[in-house]
């Protein structure tokens, strides 16, 4: 069995990713607060800002992983806020980073050691991973950081048989 675990697959790019993986024969698991409406997707409801919820979800996912020949762990969940340097409070930035970055780190930390060789860790980036536009302060910061996380992951996973990329 080949498996895709996608955070935030309930809407947008995550939902489209779920459809694409299903079309390629993957068993797809959506990890998010809301269910994915795509038929055939297994939903694991999880608040990605809550450490206990992530830990419980990872316990469930470890069983899924043990039954898989290959896993694509797709970090897609994201908050996109319209904010600016002068408007974004530290609390608001922390909330965005919790979903956009810290959740990916938590999932990696708890699941990487269980992924079989030939698996992949995919980060959903943006053109704003490398540039900026006005009115997207917290989003730009988090996407730049996600690119850094992928680059660091690439170095750390070298030789493990696990591929990583930012898309």
Give the positions of each predicted feature.
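N-terminal Rossmann NAD(P)H-binding glycine-rich loop of SDR-like oxidoreductase domains
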Residues: 10, 18
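Substrate-binding pocket helix/loop in short-chain dehydrogenase/reductase
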Residues: 84-85, 89-94
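Alpha-helical segment proximal to the catalytic Tyr-Lys
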Residues: 113, 155-156
